[in-house]
Every structure is written in structure tokens, then in C-alpha cells.
């Protein structure tokens, strides 16, 4: 069977790393991005610049590929649905529709007996005042929030002005007494067919991932519960490809699912060097119908995100043999922008 030509929507670092993994497997990639300077132009076999909602651009893209995947979840559902009518989209657009909304995402998790933080839907200021048991809490937009965007910490009901715009739809989540954050990256190939990575421990600054390490420090009980919950999510979604479930552990060692990322995940970047098969290669293998190989951890590892001007001190640095530097080749350095990462393995 010949290998498919793979279309990837999105030209950021995740698209770049997916394209690099595909090249290793001799799979041609065509990337569609609405950013003419997207870094993935340096990694894809072919690059198309254009509006995701321009039907002519979409048709040109689809003529060049056999199937489509994507690097980020905030693509409008209707766009993915239209594409899926012409060429197969994996993971399914229906999954994206569910996960794009924090309220339906949490309802899905709870329906499958997966514990989340306490939450309530918020439509106006009165809703916050009525639901003060969720304070202190985080007020989040139901859609389009990432890396801390669209989030507001609420310490009391008077923190918001009367003119605050609630039209986007919000969810208020009670803040847990946080001990640590972890993530579980899993690739599902089909019914009960998985490759799953052990939990990764994560540390954030300004609500942006700063560094990660594998293995995470935790009890076997919590580890196994997190792995089981991640598998349940993938199975119940009928997911194909790599995805991630982010978790909180509180100071009483209770586990809470925070959110689902229906794509490869920033915390999983270290798998490029820590494992024989990375999260990116497993995603390509799953969506392209290639053989599932046993994924093994070879090294413990730590990953440091290089954010904004952090990248500048690493560009001409000499690295040790156990250090691996990745420059995303973004044209412009911006504050709070992920510019690259450094992975250190323990030999």
C-alpha cells in the first residue's frame, strides 16, 4: 500500500514538528496556513498560504492531499466538516466541536465518570453572585481560550465591572488547592489500540507552559488513574491520532481532569528525545494507517520552553551531548510567544 500525502492545517511549531516526523516516514506533507510567515514553511514539502474559509484555497489544498489533520483545535467546525466531506479529516471534526467548548467538554468528562474541578455556566454578573461557592475561581471563555487567554481570576463577586461583556459565554471553575499539574499523551490507533506515554509533570509561568519532565513525581495510584482516564477519553471519543489530557493534583492527592487537547501537545515535545517513537511520529502513524509500534521510554527527560527573548541566548550556544535545541524559526520574537525548546535527557 502506498503512503498517503498528508495535509496539515496550521503552520506553527506543532505543524512543523508533525511535518518533520512525516518526513522521517517518507510521507509528503502539504501545510495550509493563514500566516504567510508561518514557521512550518521551513519544514513542509509544500506550503499553501490562504484563508481557511476561502473555498478556492481549500479546494487547491485538498487536490494535493489524500487526508487531512490539524495542529490546533480552534478551527471552525463548519470548515472541518466541509473538508471531511471531500477528504478524510482525523481526528474527526465532531471531536473538535465537542472539545472546543469548555462546558460540553466538562459534561463529556463527567458523563464518563472522570472527575473535573467544580464548575458552573455563567451568562451574566448575577450568575456569579448566585454561585459564590465557586469563588475563588477562574472565569473562562467557553471557546477560543489558550495559554491563559480569555481567563480571569475571581476572588469575589465584585471583581468584575457591571459593563463586563458576557456575550461570548463563560464558565466559572472553582480553584483547587493545587499541588502539581500533569499531562498524559496518548495515541489511539483504533478500538482498544493505544500507545500511551507515562504522565509528564508540568510547570507554568503566566499560564504558559515553562518546563516539563518525565517521569512525573507521583504515586502509582494517581499515575494509573490518570492513564486509565486518558484511555477512556480517547476510546469514548473514538479518537484517531495523538491527544493529551491535562490534569490537576491537589494537596490531598485528588486527581482532576482539567482539559482535553485533541492534538499533539507542548508537554509531549520531550518525547522526541526521551522515547523511541515521539508523539508526533505516533500521530502520523495513526492518522495515515501505518503500523503501530511499541513505544518505549529510553531516557528520563526535561523540556524547557523558550519563550520570547529567551531564544536569543540559545541560538549560538554550544550544547552538551545530552541537550537538544529546537528553534521554531519564527520570524519575529514576541513576548509570551513560544520560540523554541530545549530538551535535556538523563543518560
Where do the PLM segments sit?
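ATP-binding N-terminal substructure of ATP-dependent carboxylate-amine bond-forming enzymes
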Residues: 1-100, 104
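Peripheral (often C-terminal) accessory segments that flank ATP-dependent C-N-forming ligase machineries
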Residues: 2, 285-347
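Short, hydrophobic beta-strand segments that form beta-sheet elements in well-ordered domains
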Residues: 8, 28-33, 68-71, 120-121, ...
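Active-site nucleotide/adenylate-binding loops and adjacent lid/helix of ATP-dependent enzymes
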Residues: 98-183, 187-233
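Short acidic-glycine loop/turn motifs at beta-strand connectors
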Residues: 188-193, 250-253, 346-347
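Protein kinase-like catalytic core scaffold
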Residues: 195, 243, 255-259
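Active-site "cap" helix and flanking loop/linker of ATP-utilizing ligase/carboxylase catalytic domains
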Residues: 224-245, 251, 261-309
Amino acid at each position: 500500500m502506498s503512503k498517503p500525502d498528508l495535509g496539515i492545517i496550521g503552520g506553527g511549531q506543532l505543524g512543523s514538528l508533525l511535518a518533520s516526523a512525516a518526513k522521517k516516514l517518507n510521507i509528503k506533507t502539504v501545510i495550509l496556513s493563514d500566516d504567510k510567515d508561518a514557521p512550518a514553511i521551513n519544514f513542509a514539502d509544500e506550503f499553501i498560504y490562504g484563508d481557511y474559509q476561502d473555498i478556492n484555497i481549500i479546494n487547491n489544498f485538498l487536490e494535493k492531499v489524500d487526508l487531512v489533520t490539524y495542529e490546533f483545535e480552534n478551527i471552525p467546525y463548519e470548515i472541518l466538516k466541509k473538508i471531511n466531506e471531500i477528504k478524510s479529516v482525523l481526528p474527526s471534526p465532531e471531536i473538535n466541536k465537542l472539545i472546543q467548548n469548555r462546558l460540553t467538554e466538562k459534561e463529556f468528562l463527567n458523563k464518563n465518570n472522570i472527575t473535573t474541578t467544580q464548575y458552573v455556566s455563567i451568562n451574566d454578573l448575577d450568575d456569579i453572585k448566585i454561585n459564590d461557592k465557586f469563588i475563588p475561581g477562574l472565569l473562562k471563555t467557553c471557546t477560543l481560550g489558550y495559554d491563559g487567554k480569555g481567563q480571569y481570576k475571581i476572588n469575589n463577586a465584585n471583581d468584575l465591572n457591571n459593563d463586563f461583556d458576557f456575550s461570548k459565554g463563560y464558565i466559572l471553575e472553582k480553584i483547587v488547592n493545587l499541588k502539581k499539574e500533569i499531562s498524559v499523551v496518548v495515541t489511539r490507533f483504533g478500538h482498544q489500540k493505544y500507545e500511551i506515554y507515562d504522565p509528564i509533570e508540568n510547570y507554568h509561568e503566566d499560564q504558559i507552559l515553562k518546563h516539563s519532565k518525565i517521569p512525573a513525581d507521583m504515586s502509582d495510584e494517581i499515575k494509573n488513574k490518570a492513564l486509565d482516564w486518558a484511555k477512556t477519553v480517547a476510546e469514548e471519543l473514538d479518537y484517531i491520532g495523538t491527544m493529551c489530557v491535562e490534569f490537576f493534583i491537589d494537596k490531598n492527592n485528588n486527581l482532576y481532569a482539567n482539559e482535553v487537547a485533541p492534538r499533539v501537545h507542548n508537554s509531549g515535545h520531550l518525547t522526541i528525545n526521551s522515547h523511541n517513537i515521539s508523539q508526533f511520529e505516533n500521530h502520523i502513524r495513526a492518522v495515515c494507517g501505518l503500523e503501530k509500534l511499541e513505544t518505549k521510554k529510553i531516557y528520563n527527560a526535561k523540556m524547557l520552553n523558550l519563550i520570547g527573548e529567551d531564544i536569543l541566548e540559545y541560538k549560538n550556544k554550544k550544547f552538551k551531548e545530552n541537550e537538544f535545541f529546537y528553534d521554531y524559526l519564527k520570524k519575529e520574537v514576541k513576548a509570551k510567544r513560544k520560540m523554541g525548546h530545549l530538551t535535556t535527557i538523563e543518560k
